Amino acid sequence: MKAVMLAAGVGRRLYGHQNDDLPKALLRFEGKTLLERHVGILKALGVDELVLIVGHRKEDLLAEAEKIAPRGSGGFIRSVFNPRFKEGPIVSLWTAGEELRSGDDVLFMDSDVLYPPEMMSRLIRSVHDNCFIIDRDFEPGEEPVKLCIRDG
């Protein structure tokens, strides 16, 4: 299984429209960047590769990726550049299209979500071919990601 992670965005909801701030994947929680945390969880759960879709400040993301999983030691992280990253996450999803159509099992995730390890484990070990993680207590707001559920 491989993971495809969107990390190309400029973080408008966090930083505003005109920014040059670090990518959200480089925010630190308990001394680790989100990216470092994600890589640790994915490796522990047996994921073979992380395909990181980069754009905004890609050099910073790639430097962190190299620090976490050096290419010379087997290269767990492979990057794909989205030159149109300012156009939103749907373009990054399109950039990852080849990875998603490869026929491999794919875990698709955002880099800016603090995923609990137990939640990731449950998702990866699911017997279903396609599944989503859903917070049923979530109050929808302006967040652009929504999921409609039939009969429930």
Regions found by a protein language model. Give the residues of each.
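Conserved core of the sugar-phosphate nucleotidyltransferase
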Residues: 116-152
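Short beta-strand-to-loop acidic/aromatic patch adjacent to the donor-nucleotide binding site
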Residues: 103-114
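Short phosphate-binding loop-to-helix
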Residues: 60-105
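N-terminal glycine-rich phosphate-binding loop and ensuing alpha1 helix
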Residues: 1-61
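Alpha-helix termination/capping residues and helix-transition junctions
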Residues: 44, 99-100, 125
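Residues at the starts of beta-strands that form the adenosine-phosphate
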Residues: 2, 48-50, 76, 105, ...
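Short beta-strand/turn micro-motifs composed of small residues
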Residues: 7, 54, 110, 134-135
